[in-house]
């Protein structure tokens, strides 16, 4: 970290660190949004890392994957594998944004928004991270930019309610 500080770096973005399937895919196959993945150390180690970054004036930004989940996600397991997604309100049968990766979250479903808002607040409060980079941000939306903006605003408001200066970066290719 001293070397990074000497370079003048003022922020570090970590790839997805929440629990994911296996030890491959760099965290982009998420299943639990409130748990640190086993491959990245202990909660205490992450807290120490964030504290050490902050001592050097370096912000810590987490890459969050809220557009899809794997079959190991508890909300996916509530419904038998292979059943019609139409019976599972947590996920879209067909992604409205055109990218089909794992199971696509239904961000129009109020409990989905509540769960993700709480996850964002959790990492800010428990680990003192400084903000988020949202992977495949158009995956948060319906079929229009207005829908994406509405849902992103919902999450931003949840973040700002606990950390007014937090970063919230939308990323889409």
Where are the regions a protein language model picked out?
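Substrate-binding/active-site clefts of carbohydrate-active enzymes
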Residues: 1-161, 172
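Glycoside hydrolase catalytic-domain groove-lining segments
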Residues: 55, 166-167
């Amino acid at each position: 970290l001293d070397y990074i500080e000497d370079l003048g770096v003022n922020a570090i973005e970590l790839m997805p660190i929440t629990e994911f399937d296996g030890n491959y895919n760099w965290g982009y196959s998420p299943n639990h949004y409130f748990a640190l993945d086993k491959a990245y150390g202990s909660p205490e180690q992450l807290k120490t890392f964030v504290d050490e970054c902050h001592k050097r004036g370096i912000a810590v930004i987490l890459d969050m994957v809220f557009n899809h989940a794997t079959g190991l996600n508890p909300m996916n397991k509530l419904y038998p594998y292979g059943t019609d997604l139409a019976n599972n309100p947590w996920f879209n049968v067909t992604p409205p944004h055109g990218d089909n990766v794992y199971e696509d979250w239904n961000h129009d479903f109020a409990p989905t928004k509540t769960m993700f808002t709480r996850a964002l607040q959790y990492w800010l409060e428990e680990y003192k991270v400084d903000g988020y980079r949202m992977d495949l941000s158009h995956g948060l939306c319906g079929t229009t930019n207005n829908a994406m903006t509405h849902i992103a605003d919902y999450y931003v408001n949840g973040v700002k309610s606990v950390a007014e200066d937090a970063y919230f970066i939308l990323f889409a290719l």
